[in-house]
A protein has these predicted regions:
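A short, acidic, amphipathic alpha-helical segment used as a generic capping/interface helix at domain edges
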Residues: 128-132, 170-183
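Basic (Lys/Arg-enriched) interaction patch that binds polyanionic ligands
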Residues: 68-102
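Mobile active-site "lid"/loop adjacent to the S-adenosyl-L-methionine
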Residues: 147-178
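Conserved proline-anchored active-site loop of SAM-dependent methyltransferases
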Residues: 69-82, 140-158
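Class I S-adenosyl-L-methionine
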Residues: 2-5, 141, 156, 183
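Short, glycine/charged-enriched secondary-structure capping and boundary segments
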Residues: 84-86, 105-108, 139-140, 157-160
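S-adenosyl-L-methionine
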Residues: 1-69, 77, 85, 93-142
């Protein structure tokens, strides 16, 4: 596979940053040419989730296994991987095409057996979570939102979160509409 660069701005005209997806033999890489920052998603790095899942705050909330969980803010599926590693099935909804493309590419390159088992219990869907909830016949035990855009924190977010903030819009009104739809 030859290196290929996809201009995200051609797909999403409202992005101000100069962000690209570079396709390499090792997988897709996000490139922010204005800051020279790059990010590639390697889900094999989620191996630590297997070791630390019982200590994670999500394990205190979701105490049973074999549950059906809907993740309305899929992103790079880190929280979904934690929930799945606890023995649950997760449906990840992500409406951003770029984020979904990076995630699906990373899922296709998983080498670690434990991480592979975790992601076998994760189903991904591209689209609006609100539309999905209105049309699905599935019943979920939990509906999960990650409000990762806490801008009141002065610490610099991780590289993963910095890229997500540049690509994804956090619309609190849509999140409220989803909650209203389920209640």
């Amino acid at each position: 596979m030859k290196d290929e660069i996809l201009d995200i701005n051609k797909i999403f005209n409202n992005l101000s940053e100069n962000i690209f997806i570079k396709e390499t033999n090792e997988g897709l890489i996000l490139v922010d040419s204005s800051s020279k920052m790059t990010f590639s998603l390697a889900l094999d790095d989620y191996e630590n989730i297997v070791r630390q899942n019982k200590k994670h705050v999500l394990s205190k909330i979701i105490k049973k296994d074999k549950l059906m969980v809907l993740d309305c803010t899929g992103g790079f599926a880190r929280d979904s991987a934690i929930i799945s590693s606890l023995g649950n099935n997760v449906t990840v909804i992500e409406e951003n095409l770029i984020v979904m493309r990076i995630l699906k590419d990373a899922m296709s390159r998983i080498q670690n057996r434990e991480v592979s088992c975790i992601f076998k219990r994760i189903t991904t869907k591209l689209g609006s979570c609100l539309d999905y909830i209105k049309t699905t016949n599935k019943i979920y035990d939990y509906i999960y939102f990650d409000f990762m855009f806490n801008t009141s924190n002065t610490a610099l977010p991780s590289k993963r979160e910095q890229f997500l903030r540049k690509i994804v819009k956090n619309d609190i009104d849509i999140n409220r509409a989803i909650v209203d739809e389920v209640l």
